[in-house]
A protein has these predicted regions:
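Small/polar, glycine/serine/threonine/aspartate-rich low-complexity segments that form flexible
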Residues: 2, 48-83, 206-213, 247, ...
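Amphipathic alpha-helical coiled-coil segments
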Residues: 22-37, 111, 115-134, 145, ...
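Short helix-capping/hinge motifs at transmembrane helix termini and TM-loop junctions
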Residues: 157, 197-198, 371, 410-412
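Bacterial Sec-pathway N-terminal export signals of envelope proteins
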Residues: 1-50, 98, 196-245, 297-298, ...
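Acidic, low-complexity, intrinsically disordered peripheral segments
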Residues: 1, 6, 10, 391-434
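A glycine-/polar-enriched beta->alpha junction
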Residues: 11-21, 28-43, 78-96, 106-113, ...
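Periplasmic alpha-helical coiled-coil/stalk elements that build and connect Gram-negative outer-membrane
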Residues: 1-8, 114-228, 336-339, 343, ...
Length: 434
């Protein structure tokens, strides 16, 4: 059974994309890394045991003393606790890990939104290919009609062989174009299946409609787009990471202080270095050592000093990248906004052109039927109508693409209803059905 793929469901289905799953794993990795860095605030506890148990057996011979023997079991567990009181690197490392985690989450969201936009674009393209096929089918039917009319007139003695050949050539061209559109349709289907990771057969709504309206002014587009852009946020976070890295290198010359407590114990059973072994002998001992420790790197050949300068320079570079991306986003948002307005005009003008060329074709056929026009005129009008329909299909396709692009760039949602001050019955995108 075929599943029905709805345009609105793309956002939910895209989570199956393999590339997105890969980025999700990286988010988890960054989260675990952050937890690892935060854990440095807490004490560490280590348990060691040298032989659990350990058995020693042997003999010792010396010409000046009596021979001794050893046969003994022993265990020497120790417990060590360490707490870093002053760690000059810890806070900046935690900040770096936290900012890296935010970047990983932003990267996931950036890719998710990019994939949604790309999947929607492929959906529109697949839907458009349905309309292209229907348009070329109608064109082919018109060419068949023209060919039959030319043959009929030739048989009746009022037509020419040239007109028949001309109609036949046009028919062949239209058949070839239709075949190309069908192949492109299958390619578009494969492309949509790949990005959504759909295993089963599926179908979509074939009719091409506007997916929404855009009622926001350009200033609001720019303001929201710059405030909410995740790539800009990532560059700011990268800058903070570089700053914290430079702090890390600077703090490497500061002392670290930690307190440690070591508890060691020993248990024995048996005898050691004895003339006469006593297997029932046993003993135990313990020591507890608590200390305040100090570590300070005085000189490292300038390694951390130069690394500090390097990170500061990289932070400045991120600032330039931020400003550059900001300018690019302003251009992209403004371009998309103006393209949307342009496509609105193209939709309306192409509808008017379809109406005019349809009437022109009808009149051309009537003139040809009564013998006051040529087949060439009919074929020209026929091609004009097909081109007008193609313009309308492309205009709706580009309108929907630009609408999705504006959503992606500004983080605003498209509107279901159209609000336009200069709306009138004769010429407005608001009068088109979604």
């Amino acid at each position: 059974n075929k599943i029905f793929l709805d345009y609105e469901a793309i956002e939910k289905i895209i989570i199956n994309n393999q590339e997105l799953k890969s980025l999700e794993a990286l988010v988890n990795s960054s989260r675990f890394n952050l937890s690892s860095k935060v854990s440095k605030k807490f004490p560490t506890l280590n348990l060691q045991a040298n032989g659990l148990p350990k058995y020693v057996a042997g003999k010792n011979f010396n010409s000046n003393t009596q021979k001794t023997k050893t046969s003994q079991f022993s265990a020497n567990p120790s417990l060590n606790i360490r707490l870093d009181l002053i760690d000059p690197l810890r806070d900046s490392e935690i900040k770096i890990a936290r900012e890296s985690y935010k970047i990983a989450k932003n990267n996931f969201e950036i890719k998710r939104k990019d994939l949604i936009q790309e999947a929607r674009a492929r959906y529109h393209k697949y839907q458009k290919s349905y309309q292209d096929i229907e348009n070329k089918k109608l064109t082919l039917e018109a060419s068949i009609t023209s060919f039959k009319n030319a043959e009929a007139k030739l048989k009746a003695g009022i037509g020419t062989k040239f007109e028949v050949l001309e109609a036949d050539a046009q028919l062949s061209r239209d058949e070839q174009i239709l075949n190309e559109k069908k192949i492109q349709h299958e390619i578009n289907k494969i492309s949509l299946r790949e990005i959504l990771d759909i295993k089963d057969e599926f179908e979509i709504k074939k009719s091409q409609k506007l997916t929404g309206f855009w009622n926001y002014k350009l200033n609001k587009n720019l303001r929201e787009g710059l405030q909410n852009n995740l790539s800009l946020q990532n560059l700011s976070l990268q800058k903070e990471i570089k700053k914290n890295q430079s702090i890390n290198y600077s703090n490497a010359y500061k002392p670290s202080v930690y307190i440690s407590n070591s508890f060691s114990s020993g248990f024995t059973k048996g005898d050691a270095a004895s003339i006469s072994l006593d297997s029932s002998e046993y003993g135990s001992s313990y020591t507890n050592t608590i200390s305040l420790n100090f570590s300070w790197t005085i000189f490292d050949g300038g390694e951390n000093k130069n690394s500090y300068k390097s990170s500061k320079a990289e932070a400045e570079a991120e600032e330039f990248s931020f400003n550059n991306l900001k300018n690019i986003l302003k251009t992209n948002i403004s371009t998309a906004y103006l393209n949307l307005k342009l496509n609105e005009e193209k939709i309306l003008s192409s509808l008017k052109e379809i109406s005019s060329t349809s009437e022109s074709l009808r009149l051309a056929r009537l003139r040809y039927d009564v013998g006051i026009s040529t087949l060439k005129d009919v074929l020209v009008r026929q091609k004009e109508l097909s081109n007008a329909k193609s313009k309308n299909i492309n205009a709706i396709y580009n309108y929907n693409l630009t609408l999705d692009e504006l959503e992606r760039l500004t983080f605003l949602e498209k509107n279901k209803d159209c609000i336009e001050k200069d709306n009138n019955k004769n010429k407005s995108i608001c009068n088109m059905k979604k």
